[in-house]
Swiss-Prot record:
InterPro entries: Ribosomal_bL20 (IPR005813), RIBOSOMAL_L20_CS (IPR049946), Ribosomal_protein_bL20_C (IPR035566)
Source organism of the structure: Solibacter usitatus (strain Ellin6076)
Superkingdom, taxonomy of origin: Bacteria
GO molecular-function term, one example from the UniProt record: structural constituent of ribosome
Tagged with keyword Transferase: no
The name this protein goes by in its record: Large ribosomal subunit protein bL20
Entry's Gene Ontology cellular component terms: ribonucleoprotein complex; ribosome
CDD domains on file: Ribosomal_L20 (cd07026)
GO annotation terms (biological process): ribosomal large subunit assembly; translation
Amino acid sequence: MPRVKRGTHRRASRKKVLARASGYFLTKSKLYRAAMEAVDRGLKFAYVGRKRKKRDYRRLWIVRINASCRAAGLSYSKFVHGLKAAGLDLNRKVLADVALHDDAAFRNLAELAKSALAVKESARLALEKE
């Protein structure tokens, strides 16, 4: 009988895969090959999901900011442009949190953005007259 040098390692690696597949349906949690395929597929989805999560949160933040901006009489793009013109550098996560939890503070930010846009517009009109 030939000598087996990888027995312990193979058993451990298979056990690891089957442990990861516990909770999967039918043979995907019992048979090594099916479990391996299911685990690989699951890991791919997990990897993609970690990348998607960033996009999804950014979209959610923008939706929340836009809703509060519309209530304050501004569009999202004008609001963000107004904040940049005012020199405020707040990220979307913070803005969405303020919009969700502190309506008065968000209205102050919207007024600040409106005034910065008005100053910028008046400066542009003054340059056009010259």
